């Protein structure tokens, strides 16, 4: 088996390649043999040195003969680069999946290790330049002693992937912090709305208690005034109307006596006198003329003198009754005013309570709107984070596709080298 370098005329046998690979193994022993990565690095460096020597000799020979000189570029360790690219992209993909699933920025160990290992491009470039200088003389020893570096550390695409991962972590941290703040805002708005509900209920209860107490007090006061009015009317009937009625009856009887109507008729026993009870309670005895049909002038004169006094007393009873009715009317009016005032006071309390409830409901609406706004902002933020994770996943998929394409190209180049 041999490896051919196109356009150079150089053939390297399998035995010679094995000798070059084994040249740097004496100091490392079995441990270096088991280290596949380091063995591949030494083999690539040795291959580069041999190709360089053969190309230099060929170039000198061609220059001496006057033919056109062909220069070959130094081959890159494609196998190691492709393998490390695959591992790197796979690691980024796993880290991205864990980060998207857990939504916590603490799952970043692998990414931080990659950043610390590969982000220092200056050191990698310096080591790479030093390795190129020593490749022609002491390539195996230089490859063994140099620190393990990856050729893709100089690749801008890989740096972009690292920057994308760091930005994604920072974005996740910012998303979590913002979602926490928005969630707290929504929680505070919900608690404030609940407090407004309690305030509205307390205002309604206070208004109901105050209005009920005021209305009960005024209703009781009005009822007491109405009872006084009824009592005044009852007293006036008892003390004024009844005596007035009795006086009117007595006055009418006396008037009939004066006119000779219903005067006493003498029976066969011929009673000689009649007793008349005055309004003062005094009983007066009058003699009856047995032969006449009219009272004596003396008796008529006595009855006529007492009539005006009786009429005056009748009129005074009527006037006092009217005064009592007026007093009862005032008491009735006070009762009605008290009841009306209680209703008005209750309406005022209800109005003040309704105003307070309206203000509380307005604040409640504001809190509910703030809660809805915070929830909408949180949802929008979460959707933006989801889109960011999708974009990162697409970038990783693109990197995987690029690695796959590089592998395909490398396989094709290797196939061409074998032919």
UniProtKB/Swiss-Prot annotation:
Record carries keyword Secreted: yes
UniProt KW Secreted keyword: yes
Any GO CC annotation of this UniProt entry: extracellular region
Note: Human meliodoisis patients have detectable antibody response to BipC. However, BipC does not act as a protective antigen.
Pfam families: IpaC_SipC (PF09599)
Family listed: Belongs to the SctB/SipC family.
Domain of life: Bacteria
Stated name of the protein: Effector protein BipC
Compartments, as annotated in UniProt: Secreted
Region feature Disordered, mapped onto this chain: 62-91, 338-402
Keyword annotations from UniProtKB, A to Z: Secreted, Virulence
Native organism: Burkholderia pseudomallei (strain K96243)
Principal localisation: secreted
Basic and acidic residues: bias regions: 71-91, 380-392
